Regions:
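Short extracytoplasmic/periplasmic juxtamembrane "stem" segments immediately C-terminal to an N-terminal membrane anchor
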Residues: 67-89
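A short beta-strand-turn-helix
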Residues: 82-99, 127
Length: 259
């Protein structure tokens, strides 16, 4: 039986070295693959995160835009009624308009709301917009605390010539009498829906001495003219003003404007 030749020591060392090199190469290749997969995973995770952020931002932006258009009822109606008509303080319409109408109202009075939303837009369109009548708003706050809260913000909005916008939106979003609906959050939301109104400035001014004085003046005028309910209107030319209720307002304006 032939004898199998045994590898020499050198040959065994060379073989062991080759195995070691091959093993190290395999380990290095496996490590490289793991690193590539890890980097790829990180890239994919980062990409997914970016996509998620973009989707969230897009959804948030879309939601914000939608909320700004739809969260406050009456925004479009208010714009349609008042857009383009000059305002100065309490007054809506041209200062040169020959006929003057002073409205006494409480912003949580449901009768004031109903008349303002149902009949006032046509009166404004027919008489105020053409420059025949100028209207002045006087806030009365006799129903309760919500009346006071809303009246103060409305009066503060008048300092920025935005009273009529705020008043109209307040009527569109009016809650039940003395239900506590006129919270700061609600009033801020309404004020924020008025184009061009600096909400922070209005809220800073609502408790000012100037606002208090104007509300007191409105009450004094109402008492002097015998106003017993809201809405009540004074209609006429110059200082000759006649008190009428909502039902009598259209005829009184028509008579004051003349043919």
């Amino acid at each position: 039986m032939p004898t199998v030749a045994q590898p020499s020591r050198k040959e065994r060392r060379d073989a062991a070295r080759r195995e070691r090199v091959e093993r190290e190469a395999a380990l290095a290749a496996a490590g490289a693959r793991r690193r590539r997969l890890s980097r790829l995973g990180a890239v994919l995770a980062a990409a997914a995160a970016i996509v998620a952020v973009l989707v969230a931002v897009s959804a948030s932006g879309s939601g914000t835009k939608t909320a700004s258009r739809t969260a406050v009822a009456g925004t479009s109606q208010t714009a349609a009624t008042l857009s383009g008509i000059p305002q100065h303080g309490l007054t809506l319409g041209s200062a040169k308009a020959p006929v003057r109408v002073i409205e006494f109202a409480d912003l949580q009075c449901p009768f004031c709301r109903d008349y303002s939303l149902s009949s006032m837009p046509q009166l404004i369109r027919d008489y105020v917009r053409p420059g025949k009548v100028r209207m002045e708003f006087r806030s009365l706050a006799f129903i309760g605390p919500d009346s006071v809260s809303a009246a103060r913000v409305a009066q503060a909005a008048a300092q920025q010539n935005k009273l009529w916008n705020f008043v109209d939106l307040a009527y569109h979003n009016q809650g039940k009498e003395n239900s506590g609906w006129a919270t700061d959050a609600v009033l801020r939301r309404l004020a924020g829906a008025v184009p061009g109104l600096d909400v922070n400035r209005a809220f800073a001014a609502r408790d000012s001495a100037a606002v208090t004085a104007q509300l007191n003046a409105a009450n004094a005028l109402a008492n002097a003219k015998g106003v017993q309910s809201t809405p009540t209107f004074l209609v006429g030319r110059g200082s000759s003003l006649k008190a009428v209720d909502a039902a009598g307002l259209p005829a009184a304006i028509k008579a004051a404007v003349g043919p």
